[in-house]
């Protein structure tokens, strides 16, 4: 999971639209230089977890490692903010490599929509009526009918986000599993979800779709009126996040399981 990296000297700074993030970017760029994302060895993201997610999506093509510092409200994926010794911190950082989920959603017009999700792919009811979903794993029907507000498939990195709020399990970052979690399940009432191997191919079929429309969301990419949703891990895409020594993502995931 953790790999050594070459000595880093070229940084690109990105920031959210929060004033404190923009002010931090100006100071850090003046102090350490700013080469632009295309020439950077590491991208420094200044904001919260939402901005980190956005930055990871933008780095999919280049796969440039990202070191985040918290200048937002939620900073689970971010390092503590400090302007001192930034190059030393980055060069001593631990690297967590993650793989996104690849979603193919087919809507009511039979149009295919493709997107990648770093945290989760979620299916959500669009109206007051519950959704009805059929779930297949590797071509075999495992749940004939799930009556619910929705369901999601989360990566280890995303297991502490929406998945945790939906009472799904927290997965160690190097866990070779995905979390399949129902959202407010009505039937079967006692079903709490499942842990699937990372190689699993998951298919959701939306039942009674005309009466009970469902949207499919890959992080922030939404497909309305979904009919079928196919999800698998994209092992060909690797994204790297850098964390201060002793504060790795693995340690944060472990600590989260003992938080009040």
Curated annotation (Swiss-Prot):
<dbReference type="InterPro" id="IPR017438">
    <property type="entry name" value="ATP-NAD_kinase_N"/>
</dbReference>
<feature type="binding site">
    <location>
        <position position="149"/>
    </location>
    <ligand>
        <name>NAD(+)</name>
    </ligand>
</feature>
<protein>
    <recommendedName>
        <fullName>NAD kinase</fullName>
        <ecNumber>2.7.1.23</ecNumber>
    </recommendedName>
</protein>
<keyword id="KW-0547">Nucleotide-binding</keyword>
<keyword id="KW-0521">NADP</keyword>
<comment type="function">
    <text>Involved in the regulation of the intracellular balance of NAD and NADP, and is a key enzyme in the biosynthesis of NADP. Catalyzes specifically the phosphorylation on 2'-hydroxyl of the adenosine moiety of NAD to yield NADP.</text>
</comment>
<dbReference type="Pfam" id="PF20143">
    <property type="entry name" value="NAD_kinase_C"/>
</dbReference>
<dbReference type="Pfam" id="PF01513">
    <property type="entry name" value="NAD_kinase"/>
</dbReference>
<dbReference type="GO" id="GO:0005524">
    <property type="term" value="F:ATP binding"/>
</dbReference>
<feature type="active site" description="Proton acceptor">
    <location>
        <position position="49"/>
    </location>
</feature>
<dbReference type="GO" id="GO:0019674">
    <property type="term" value="P:NAD metabolic process"/>
</dbReference>
<keyword id="KW-0963">Cytoplasm</keyword>
<feature type="binding site">
    <location>
        <position position="157"/>
    </location>
    <ligand>
        <name>NAD(+)</name>
    </ligand>
</feature>
<comment type="similarity">
    <text>Belongs to the NAD kinase family.</text>
</comment>
<dbReference type="GO" id="GO:0006741">
    <property type="term" value="P:NADP biosynthetic process"/>
</dbReference>
<dbReference type="InterPro" id="IPR016064">
    <property type="entry name" value="NAD/diacylglycerol_kinase_sf"/>
</dbReference>
<dbReference type="InterPro" id="IPR002504">
    <property type="entry name" value="NADK"/>
</dbReference>
<keyword id="KW-0520">NAD</keyword>
<feature type="binding site">
    <location>
        <begin position="119"/>
        <end position="120"/>
    </location>
    <ligand>
        <name>NAD(+)</name>
    </ligand>
</feature>
<feature type="binding site">
    <location>
        <begin position="160"/>
        <end position="165"/>
    </location>
    <ligand>
        <name>NAD(+)</name>
    </ligand>
</feature>
<keyword id="KW-0808">Transferase</keyword>
<dbReference type="GO" id="GO:0003951">
    <property type="term" value="F:NAD+ kinase activity"/>
</dbReference>
<feature type="binding site">
    <location>
        <begin position="49"/>
        <end position="50"/>
    </location>
    <ligand>
        <name>NAD(+)</name>
    </ligand>
</feature>
<keyword id="KW-0418">Kinase</keyword>
<dbReference type="GO" id="GO:0005737">
    <property type="term" value="C:cytoplasm"/>
</dbReference>
<keyword id="KW-0067">ATP-binding</keyword>
<dbReference type="InterPro" id="IPR017437">
    <property type="entry name" value="ATP-NAD_kinase_PpnK-typ_C"/>
</dbReference>
<dbReference type="GO" id="GO:0046872">
    <property type="term" value="F:metal ion binding"/>
</dbReference>
<dbReference type="GO" id="GO:0051287">
    <property type="term" value="F:NAD binding"/>
</dbReference>
